[in-house]
Amino acid sequence: MAVPKKRTSTSKKRIRKNIWKKKGYWTALKAFSLGKSLSTGNSKSFFVQQTNK
């Protein structure tokens, strides 16, 4: 079983954690932006059939 040789420093751990958090933030922002464009009808990547009532 693979075991790390030395302890990871606190700063390196914090940097990696922040990178991981930032990825989630950008993914959420993209999803929100896509949902917003779908709701306003400005989406160019999805074709939503509009129903007239």
Swiss-Prot record:
It is found in: Plastid, Chloroplast. The keyword Plastid applies. SUPFAM superfamilies: Zn-binding ribosomal proteins. Keywords: Chloroplast, Plastid, Ribonucleoprotein, Ribosomal protein. GO terms for cellular component: chloroplast; large ribosomal subunit. Coiled coil: none annotated. It comes from the Eukaryota. The keyword Transmembrane does not apply. One of its GO terms (biological process) is translation. GO terms for molecular function: structural constituent of ribosome. Belongs to the bacterial ribosomal protein bL32 family. This is Large ribosomal subunit protein bL32c. The gene is rpl32.
